[in-house]
Amino acid sequence: PEEFPQLIINSPKLWWPVNKGPQNLYDLKLTVSVDGKECDSVKTRFGIREIVSDRKTPDKSRVFYVNGKRLFIRGTNWIPEAMLRTSDERTYAELRYSRQSGVNLLRMWGGGIAESDYFFQLCDELGLLVWQEFWMTGDTRHPHDKALYMSNVESTVKRIRNHPSLAYYVASNESTEVTGTPELLNKLDGTRGFQMQSECEGVHDGSPYKQVNPMQHYENTASPRGSRVDGFNPEYGAPTLPTVEILREMMDEKDLWPINKEVWDYLDGNGFHLMSTMYTDLVNNYGKSSSIDEFAQKGQLLGAINSKSIWEVWNYNKLDYGDRFCSGLLFWYHNCSMPQVASRMWDWSLEPTASLYHTANSLEPLHAQFDYLKNTVSVVNDYYREFKDYKVIAQVYDINSKKVFEESAVVNLPSDGVVNDALTIRFPENISQVHFIKLILKDEKGKDVSSNFYWRSNDKYEGSKTLTGPAASGFEDLSKLKQAKVKLAYKVREDNNNYFVDITLRNTSGQIAFFNQLQFLNSKMSPIRPSFYTDNFFSLMPGEKKTVTIETAKGKLKDG
């Protein structure tokens, strides 16, 4: 700095991750001149920020700080495409979905790769932090060629170290570091933290991975390893069934319905996620299906509850606001590396599931949420500022869409905090077996800030060894829900590269329009992928109006 004072930036505009502030970036050009003649130059983009972590927590779990402020990690695991058949289009789509979901950190799982320069560029722009692991997992303890491995570490760090999104280095997934790695990293980049493997130094082992009763997330019994809604969990997840179009692309019709267990288990890692067993049993709690179309639609309902229950339980226990101290969750995992019946937020073919949109709702920066176990309503704030005199409203509707309960509470939201159990919903004794909950959060001026919607049954939760409970069973009567009348209008806009379809839906009936799915189809009636929906798999209350925008590249319409 003394020799080159132009490198000093006074009062810099800082780079922040999702919800915490803007993603300010600077452009830098460096030139080398000899005798006044430029002989080489390089351009780069960078951001100014500080990310550190420590274990000064009640349970010694790792907690991260960005620009001096504590950061609750709501992240996920990124799995590369199985055959490494990536492209800028695929990278853009998956990172755009990631940003839409609301997560703030992507863990580059140790069984994967270091992604492209374009990947890191987009993470910088989108505010997505990156936890980079180095290509070893539990079944690959050490590289065959240490020198080659160290050379790859060095070249990778040099390539990605200028990106503000790069937050943390980890030597391996559930394995051990190669001797000399910490020293090399410190030499190349002393600005970022490092740990030798993914389950140490304040990050405990993961789970659950498979389908469980959604009630278990609230009860903290979802993992056979004991409490896992606590501390920093690097792998905690649940599956979602793909849409029926994806299932048809994946297997023959004869294997789709009735479900051919052998084929489905093959496409589920030998039945690892229990898609042909427990997932199917939970879907059947919505009533036995007569076709794969009906089954797949009900499967989206379960996938939505899977995701919502996980994220909202971690919201409730954010940092030191809940029943247990929680510093971070990395969902296992959110993108699919290959076609599989245990999908996630989107399928390998880039077709989103209900999980994406219900995760996005759960991770909105100001969020009201319901606890199926406690029957309470809490409000979460992910901004670094407080909000006073907000009002949360809880409404309950029966199967005939009649409002049978309403209560509100005024809440003062602490900066980056939670108001837990702001009110308790008292369900009428004679309420219908299946009913609905609508939550509305209003600001101090009475303007709607966010909303949330749930379906619930009267079934009693009988423990973790059962598939019972108000989030898990007793939903057969959903088939009795009267059909709503929804009017639809749309307009098409375009820019140089994309089409935008603005769809306005209005529920003109007195019935709840339940779990509506929009699809953008080509002339062959096939979904156009990737397309970006601002929302999907949503419900509309009587009289409610909603606008959804669908965006797709113009080149995607060339095939009709």
Positions of the model-derived regions?
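Substrate-binding clefts and catalytic carboxylate motifs of secreted carbohydrate-active enzymes
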Residues: T221-Q395, V404
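Secreted/periplasmic carbohydrate-active enzymes, especially glycoside hydrolases
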Residues: P1-L106, A114, Y316, D320-C326, ...
